[in-house]
């Protein structure tokens, strides 16, 4: 291993080419959606299956008007601005300045982030790995590798899962339990899962920069470096508040190993203390905002990551790390304490369920140190990457990117039944009618699938908007579904009680049954559904 390797100086042409390819891969889903969209249809920019894209699209527009800290429009309860969304504020402002839609600014920004993350990962691998084959093996494994969860996902989706009881009991039923998922099904736990996801590319980049700044401050100690590390920790926490806990877990794990090995005890203690203070300061600021908002802290918890699922996420890397751990630790200095501490911090947090509410956040960035240490163990002693080793790598890491490519290909294909991805002229007319009539405090009631395409351009509030941001979401969502399934006899009472002004009913929910509701007036009708406006005062005036 190198004692004083370069970081970004002298990056080879191949690394730049790889970064450009990664950036192009980020653009492919949107490019394909644009190509397959029929005349008259608009690509919204949401070619992902995640409902969070609706949330981000709302924030891009809302933050441009309200500022980098926004109020919560996904719930009916009054609240003061408390959600820090600086990234979406920048996206919205760039969109306003350029005239490009926020979604396309978001996608192009993601391409830049993908390129930067690729260069950062390459530079990090080069810093810790001196042998060229080890470097490229680690780099490619991090950027496009995964685990064996792709096989499980494929098996679960296949007819075999329904034809054989043993497959159902071993795979289908366990993964059908609430909040049980392999890493392949999560958005940001692998780099390859994040390549088409601008949001998680940003988080990966900020978290990795913060961890590397922490290491640099220890290695080349100065108070300026300490300050930069603290700022990096604070910045990553502002971008995604969960990362603050992950970063502190890494920092304290590195510090513990350095103390055990009697390596730079003062330096690691000083840097850890500064970074801890920075993260706590951000937590305090966000806590103050939430406390003043008038809304409770959301009760949502992330999915637990079981030890076996974590092993299946990186099986080859875990085997190599455990195989060579004793020697790797015995010969280690600061660099090895840092990488092992990084692994330990992420792993402990990942396996902290049920006590820590968001354990899946610990996986983010784990792939980098785990893969680098695994490569160092394998190539120690001049081992070669022969055809058999390459085949094993592909077998144990290749299912994830294959499944991800297939999912992205499917999700970016045209579907006239998914207006959150492709807006028809009728859909755009419905949105225009809603925006013409709506005020900022008006409440919209719509089914889950319809919120995904109505929400981004809607300036008002939602009765049941988002699983994390809506107060008492489960109850409100269930009430929405019950109302849409009902015979509409209690619709007027429900709409009045919850001060709902706009009510969208898709064709699949039979909007005709709501035409007899007193005060519920069709505002805009298409073949796909009816946008109603509830005007109880008109009913009182007619009575």
Where are these regions (language model features)?
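Aromatic-anchored segments of alpha-helical transmembrane domains
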Residues: 23-27, 142-148, 233-238, 276-287, ...
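Active-site lumenal/periplasmic loops and adjacent helix-entry segments of GT-C-fold
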Residues: 23-208, 215, 241-245, 420-421, ...
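Extracytoplasmic
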Residues: 52-54, 167, 171, 397-543
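Transmembrane alpha-helical segments
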Residues: 117-125, 204-218, 248-257, 318-325, ...
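Short hydrophobic alpha-helices at membrane interfaces in multi-pass membrane enzymes
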Residues: 213-234
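Transmembrane catalytic cores of multi-pass membrane glycosyltransferases
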Residues: 227, 236-337, 344, 353-358, ...
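Hydrophobic/aromatic-rich transmembrane helices and adjacent perimembrane loops
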Residues: 245-247, 357-382, 392-393
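Signature aromatic-anchored transmembrane alpha helix within multi-pass, membrane-resident enzymes
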Residues: 270-281, 380-408
């Amino acid at each position: 291993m190198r004692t004083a390797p370069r970081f970004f100086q002298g990056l080879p042409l191949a690394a730049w080419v790889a970064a450009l390819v990664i950036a192009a891969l980020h653009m492919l889903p949107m490019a394909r959606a644009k190509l397959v969209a029929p005349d008259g249809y608009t690509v919204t920019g949401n070619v992902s299956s995640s409902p969070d894209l609706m949330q981000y699209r709302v924030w891009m527009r809302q933050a441009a008007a309200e500022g980098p800290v926004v109020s919560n429009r996904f719930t009916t309860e009054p609240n003061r601005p408390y959600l820090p969304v600086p990234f979406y504020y920048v996206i919205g402002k760039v969109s306003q300045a350029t005239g490009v839609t926020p979604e396309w600014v978001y996608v192009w920004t993601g391409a830049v982030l993908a390129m930067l993350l690729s260069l950062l990962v390459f530079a990090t691998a080069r810093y810790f790995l001196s042998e060229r084959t080890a470097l490229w093996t680690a780099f490619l494994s991090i950027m496009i590798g995964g685990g064996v969860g792709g096989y499980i996902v494929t098996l679960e989706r296949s007819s075999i899962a329904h034809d054989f009881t043993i497959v159902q009991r071993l795979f289908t039923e366990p993964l059908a339990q609430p909040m049980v998922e392999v890493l392949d099904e999560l958005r940001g736990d692998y780099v390859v899962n994040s390549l088409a996801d601008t949001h998680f590319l940003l988080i990966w980049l900020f978290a990795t920069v913060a961890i590397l700044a922490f290491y640099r401050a220890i290695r080349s100690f100065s108070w300026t470096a300490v300050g930069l590390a603290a700022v990096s920790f604070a910045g990553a926490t502002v971008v995604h508040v969960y990362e603050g806990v992950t970063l502190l877990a890494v920092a304290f794990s590195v510090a513990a190993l350095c103390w055990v090995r009697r390596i730079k005890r003062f330096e690691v203690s000083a840097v850890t203390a500064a970074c801890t203070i920075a993260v706590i300061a951000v937590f305090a600021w966000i806590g103050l905002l939430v406390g003043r908002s008038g809304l409770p802290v959301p009760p949502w918890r992330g999915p637990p990551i079981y030890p076996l699922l974590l092993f299946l996420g990186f099986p080859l890397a875990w085997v190599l790390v455990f195989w060579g751990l004793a020697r790797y630790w015995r010969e280690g200095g600061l660099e090895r304490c840092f990488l092992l501490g990084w692994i330990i911090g992420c792993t402990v947090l990942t396996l902290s369920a049920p006590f820590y509410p968001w354990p899946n956040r610990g996986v983010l960035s784990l792939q980098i140190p785990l893969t680098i240490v695994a490569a160092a163990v394998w190539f120690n002693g001049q081992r070669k990457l022969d055809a058999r080793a390459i085949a094993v790598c592909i077998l144990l890491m290749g299912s994830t990117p294959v499944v991800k490519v297939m999912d992205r290909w499917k999700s970016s294909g045209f579907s006239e039944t998914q207006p959150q991805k492709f807006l028809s002229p009728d859909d755009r007319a419905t949105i225009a009618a809603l925006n013409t009539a709506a005020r900022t405090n008006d409440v919209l009631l719509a089914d889950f699938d319809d919120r995904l395409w109505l929400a981004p351009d809607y300036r008002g509030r939602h009765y049941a908007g988002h699983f994390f941001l809506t107060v008492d979401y489960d109850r409100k969502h269930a009430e929405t579904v019950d109302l849409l399934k009902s015979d509409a006899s209690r619709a007027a009472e429900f709409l009045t009680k919850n001060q709902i002004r706009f009510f969208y009913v898709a064709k699949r929910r039979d909007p005709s049954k709501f035409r007899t509701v007193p005060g519920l007036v069709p505002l805009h009708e298409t073949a796909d559904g009816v946008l109603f406006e509830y005007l109880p005062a008109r009913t009182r005036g007619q009575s």
